[in-house]
Amino acid sequence: MFEKIENKWTEDSGDYDDMIQKQLSNKRTVSYWTKELKRLLGPEPLRILEVGCGPGFMSIIAARLGHDVKAIDGSSRIVEKARRNMRQYHQQVEICEEDGVTLPLEQEQSYDVILSRDAVWTLYDPEKAFRRWKAVLKPGGRI
């Protein structure tokens, strides 16, 4: 199932990246999400994992706010686009191709926050994902 989902997003990666580029160039959209992340995350720098990062919109904003971000996506082509966007927007974000359900590369209690915008519906086993996400959060961490 993971492979089918990955293939679909790989096929649609160009269109999805075009949409994200429009969002990143729209000051109102960037301002809205910047305010929302400030409100949700607070002023202290956090270790954040973005699951299903796509071309990197939320990771770019979180990194601009001073957070230490790792972004993962299941599509190799999307990961390439996210890396390009990080360079284009001068952000230091670790980006990896990784299964967002099993998180095979993540250690227990590693993150303060897990972000996921528009990706939960694509998970092939959401219950398993949420259990795993909880395991990689530090005590008191938030999804």
Q: Over which residues does each language-model region extend?
A:
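Ligand-binding pocket scaffold of soluble enzyme catalytic domains
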Residues: 24, 33, 61, 85, ...
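Short conserved AdoMet
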Residues: 42, 64, 124, 138
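Conserved class I S-adenosyl-L-methionine
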Residues: 1-43
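A short acidic, Gly/Pro-enriched loop at the edge of an enzyme's catalytic core
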Residues: 101-114
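A short SAM/SAH-binding and catalytic strip from SAM-dependent methyltransferases
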Residues: 113-125
